[in-house]
Design a protein with these regions (language model features):
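Bacterial N-terminal signal peptides
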Residues: 2-14
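Hydrophobic alpha-helix-in-membranes signature
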Residues: 13-15, 32, 186
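Boundary at the C-terminal end of the N-terminal hydrophobic targeting segment
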Residues: 14-24
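Active-site-proximal helix/loop segments of hydrolytic enzymes
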Residues: 26, 55-239
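Short glycine-rich His-centered loop
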Residues: 27-47
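Acidic active-site catalytic centers that drive phospho-/nucleotidyl reactions
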Residues: 32, 39, 50, 100-102, ...
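Short glycine-enriched, charge-decorated loop/helix-capping segments at active-site entrances
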Residues: 44-49, 204-208
Length: 239
């Protein structure tokens, strides 16, 4: 941890105009492109790497959200970043949302759906969503607990917008002990945006037009969450 000390500076500012409406600060959205550097993530049959897809998608989402929100990326280039550092960036910047981006892999070359995860402490077999022993041992994982209801709503909003791109098998909203979500002190979700091990889906995830549509859908889901953060019932979620 780096502590930065800043000297106090007194500024002479004009007196505020009485009656002028206060301007609220824009919401902060942190986009986390999964993997990076030597941690390549899933590799598609055509050689596409998860780390590259997630970074391209993150930049497109950033572009779609700018102007309405303060948008930060946990990484802006191809380098390794530990999971706790990703969550730490969101916490340090007092983010209102954390969106972690991934792609999936499967032994089945026809697997093709969209999974949007929110945090739970239940076990699940998935390298992107399984919490590490270190994260399970730290009390920081407890900070996500109060945000789980809101995280599930955020996941539902995003999935509702993006599922049309996966018409034959739209997937769903799933609880999982995702390590990157465990210590997030704000609503947070992890998006598995398709299977690179499916040649057709790999082609889609290399297509800029397709990625733009996906980025737009995710951005609309974020807008929907901020505009309508009402509670949804458990029957709306795939357990």
């Amino acid at each position: 941890m780096v502590v930065i000390l800043t000297a106090a500076v007194t500024l002479l500012l004009p007196a505020p105009i009485l009656g002028a409406p206060a301007q609220s600060a824009p919401k902060t959205v942190v986009i986390d492109p999964g993997h990076g550097g030597g941690d390549t993530g899933v590799k598609g049959t055509g050689g596409t790497l998860e780390k590259d897809v997630t970074l391209r998608l993150a930049r497109l989402i950033e572009n779609r959200l700018q102007g309405r929100y303060r948008v930060l990326l946990t990484r802006n280039d191809d380098y390794i970043m530990p999971g706790p550092d990703r969550t730490g960036q969101a916490n340090h910047n007092n983010a209102d949302l954390l969106i972690s981006l991934h792609t999936a892999g499967s032994y089945s070359p026809t697997a093709n759906d969209l999974q949007v995860y929110y945090y739970t402490e239940a076990e699940i077999r998935n390298p992107d969503t399984a919490a590490s022993g270190e994260s399970k041992a730290t009390p920081w994982r407890k900070v996500q607990k109060p945000h789980i209801p809101a995280s599930s709503i955020l996941a539902q909003r995003i999935w509702e917008r993006a599922k049309g791109l996966y018409a034959n098998n739209p997937g769903g909203v799933v609880p999982a002990p995702a390590a990157v979500l465990a210590g997030a002190d704000m609503p947070a979700v992890l998006i598995e945006s398709g299977y690179l091990t499916n040649p057709k889906q790999e082609k889609n995830l290399n297509d800029n037009k397709y990625l733009f549509k996906l980025a737009s859908a995710i951005s609309q889901g974020i807008d929907d969450y901020f505009n309508n953060p009402e509670t949804i019932t458990s029957t709306d979620l795939r357990e």
